[in-house]
């Protein structure tokens, strides 16, 4: 499959002096730390029921096997699966982890609470779910704890920046499908969103999620996702978060996608056009949902993402 893009970059990259080095080719072996706990979250017998258990939230961390004191850019990736399935160890994500860590990034892949976990949700989400088709209500509700957990993972990364030598000035968040919905929300919304709606009294597991940490997202990778999470945020709370400070985004979407409609991608592109923000646009002709094997000008997704991040973040490539 190839793209019929009308040009990968709508605007030129900002003139950022290169300060952090990555490598065009694989430079190091990759060390992987699996199942690191980044926090805890509640799981209810039914949505918000008093019967609950506490679940560990886990991530895998990929890093170069080298002893340099140089700080490394960070790439957090969120798996898809309709908020009801999927895994941080999905084959394509493992490939991304090895690809980027071998070239100088610290790459993080997370698991998060899904529909079957029934994480704690704000009452206004419960009320709003009454207006969602019955077959989609669980997915709708699971969106909140998924976002909340991704937010916790970003705070964990910030809390461990010294331990892992992380350069928080070059932070990318990406995902596929449902994970891309969450990634877009993480990049566009504010740090208090998907956090302050439930208090520590109602959900004491928040104490395990480094709530004092801060961070800023510098690039978003949207693989066949949408801005649905932001739409819900605006609909329920009146928070319209798009503005001229939003980070550059790379949008990849199959033009024949019947799961997350291609119109979702064009709508997001239009948001960026309206704000005159930088983006890369890759509509994949003839592709349905999840075109992991897509190529544009002979480049796969891994290389396209590499090019986008290094250009937009002003990374020095050797």
Predicted regions and their residues:
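Primarily recognizes the serine-hydrolase "nucleophile elbow" in alpha/beta-hydrolase
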Residues: 148, 152-241
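N-terminal cap/lid segment of alpha/beta-hydrolase-fold proteins
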Residues: 13-70
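Short beta-strand element of the alpha/beta-hydrolase
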Residues: 70-82
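Conserved alpha/beta-hydrolase "acid-adjacent" motif
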Residues: 258-264
């Amino acid at each position: 499959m190839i793209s019929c893009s009308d040009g990968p970059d709508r605007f030129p990259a900002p003139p950022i002096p290169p300060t952090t080095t990555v490598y065009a080719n694989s430079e190091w072996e990759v060390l992987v730390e699996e199942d690191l706990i980044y926090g805890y979250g509640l799981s209810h017998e039914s949505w918000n029921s008093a019967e609950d258990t506490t679940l560990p939230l886990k991530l895998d961390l990929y890093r170069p096997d080298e002893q340099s004191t140089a700080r490394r850019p960070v790439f957090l990736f969120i798996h898809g699966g309709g908020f009801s399935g999927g895994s941080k160890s999905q084959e394509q994500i493992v490939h991304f982890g090895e690809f980027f860590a071998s070239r100088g990034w610290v790459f993080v892949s997370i698991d998060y609470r899904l529909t079957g976990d029934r994480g704690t949700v704000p009452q206004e989400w419960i009320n709003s779910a009454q207006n969602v088709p019955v077959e989609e209500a669980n997915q709708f509700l699971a969106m909140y704890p998924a976002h909340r957990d991704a937010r916790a993972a970003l705070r964990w990364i910030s809390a461990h920046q010294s331990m892992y030598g992380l350069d928080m000035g070059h932070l990318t968040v990406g995902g596929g499908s449902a994970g891309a919905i969450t990634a877009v929300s993480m990049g566009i919304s504010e740090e208090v969103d998907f956090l302050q709606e439930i208090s520590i009294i109602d959900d004491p597991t928040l104490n395990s999620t480094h709530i004092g940490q801060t961070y800023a997202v510098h690039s978003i990778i949207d693989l066949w996702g949408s801005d649905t999470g932001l739409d819900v945020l605006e609909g329920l709370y009146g928070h319209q978060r798009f503005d001229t400070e939003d980070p550059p985004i790379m949008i990849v979407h199959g033009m024949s996608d019947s799961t997350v409609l291609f119109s979702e991608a064009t709508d997001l592109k239009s948001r960026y056009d309206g704000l005159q923000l930088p983006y890369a646009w890759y509509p994949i002709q003839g592709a349905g949902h999840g075109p992991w094997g897509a190529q544009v000008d002979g480049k796969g997704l891994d290389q396209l993402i590499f090019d986008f991040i290094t250009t937009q973040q002003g990374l020095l490539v050797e």
